[in-house]
Amino acid sequence: MSLVGKNRAIFNYKNQKLLNRNFLYKDFEKTKSYRTNFSNSKFGSTSFRAAHFKYCSFLNCSFADCDFIGTNFRGSYFSTTTFENCIFSSVVFDQVKFKNTSFKNCYFFGSSAHIQALLSDMDENTVLPAPPAQNTVSPALKEVIDSLRTNDIIRRSHTLHGKGESINTATLLMLHSIYTDEQLITLLPLIP
């Protein structure tokens, strides 16, 4: 969910030590953190959409079910860090150092050569040049997803909807690894 009208400063950190923290179900959308130490922290079901984490340290951290869309990790350091069931799209990894970092069942769209080389021996991840095209969504599923635009929370979370009238096909690709089109057509309208 976007932080429109909310205080983004609560998740903006500069030169801080945030050790052993649990950032579960947090929204770091459009926040800015610089030179911050997040060692031994857990990030679960967290959104990092358009967030900046420049020159931050992530030692012994775990990221589960997170989305990194347009996130900037320039100069950050990841050591003994695990990423599981995460989506990476248009993420900046300039000058990032990875040491003993593992990715499991992650989706990468538009990844740099640096990340592709890192993932070369990890075959349980999906690496694509771009998210699937909009026309790959079946008309019946598109109709169900469009009907959910009336739900303000779902629409602002960008989980199913992109900018304008587009559909977030990256999330749909992840959902299709678990559910069929028919199951999604049946289950998505049940979201409150």
Which residues are covered by each model-predicted region?
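Short amphipathic alpha-helical segments
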Residues: M1-V4, L188-P192
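Charged/polar low-complexity intrinsically disordered segments, enriched in acidic residues
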Residues: A133-L190
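Tandem repeat scaffolds
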Residues: M1-E143
